Amino acid sequence: MATRNPPPQEYESDDDSYEVLDLTEYARRHHWWNRVFGHSSGPMVEKYSVATQIVMGGVSGWCAGFLFQKVGKLAATAVGGGFLLLQIASHSGYVQIDWKRVEKDVNKAKRQIKKRANKAAPEINNIIEEATEFVKQNIVISSGFVGGFLLGLAS
């Protein structure tokens, strides 16, 4: 049959007092990536051995390269398959393509992209400068990442 739970006062004792710690505020202020990559953290050379840096860069690069390869292969298959089906439908007479209109739309898109690229140039240059500075300060882990990325693409 069903058992009754004892009243709550039987569980409580004055000897057992616990302090509840709220770590959410600490976690908001102290992100792990600030310790690893933050401006005050200094270059990786000062923190980890060369072997550790190469392994960290190589493993993260391999993961990125492997994912890039798989996603790229999937995207290329989807785009190529869609284009192939469109060509088959066009040659079979199911679809009529107005190539002059396509060319006009492509040229319009090119002009819009050039306008937006000129406006976004300062932000992009700032990001490139920051990335270049990071690579200069952490050349060992960066070279490990590049090597791992290439291995990930090859696997």
Swiss-Prot record:
It comes from the Eukaryota. The gene is FUNDC1. This is FUN14 domain-containing protein 1. Belongs to the FUN14 family. There is a cross-link at K119 (Glycyl lysine isopeptide (Lys-Gly) (interchain with G-Cter in ubiquitin)). Integral mitochondrial outer-membrane protein that mediates the formation of mitochondria-associated endoplasmic reticulum membranes (MAMs). In turn, mediates angiogenesis and neoangiogenesis through interference with intracellular Ca(2+) communication and regulation of the vascular endothelial growth factor receptor KDR/VEGFR2 expression at both mRNA and protein levels. Also acts as an activator of hypoxia-induced mitophagy, an important mechanism for mitochondrial quality and homeostasis, by interacting with and recruiting LC3 protein family to mitochondria. Interacts (via YXXL motif) with MAP1 LC3 family proteins MAP1LC3A, MAP1LC3B and GABARAP. Interacts with DNM1L/DPR1. Interacts with GPX4. The YXXL motif mediates the interaction with MAP1 LC3 family proteins MAP1LC3A, MAP1LC3B and GABARAP. GO terms for cellular component: mitochondrial outer membrane. It is a multi-pass membrane protein. It comes from Bos taurus (Bovine). Phosphorylation at Ser-13 by CK2 and at Tyr-18 by SRC inhibits activation of mitophagy. Following hypoxia, dephosphorylated at Tyr-18, leading to interaction with MAP1 LC3 family proteins and triggering mitophagy. Dephosphorylation is mediated by PGAM5. Phosphorylated by ULK1 at Ser-17 which enhances FUNDC1 binding to LC3. Ubiquitinated on Lys-119. Deubiquitinated by USP19; leading to hypoxia-induced DRP1 oligomerization and GTPase activity. A motif (YXXL) lies at residues 18-21. One of its GO terms (biological process) is response to hypoxia. The modification Phosphotyrosine is found at Y18. It holds the Pfam family FUN14.
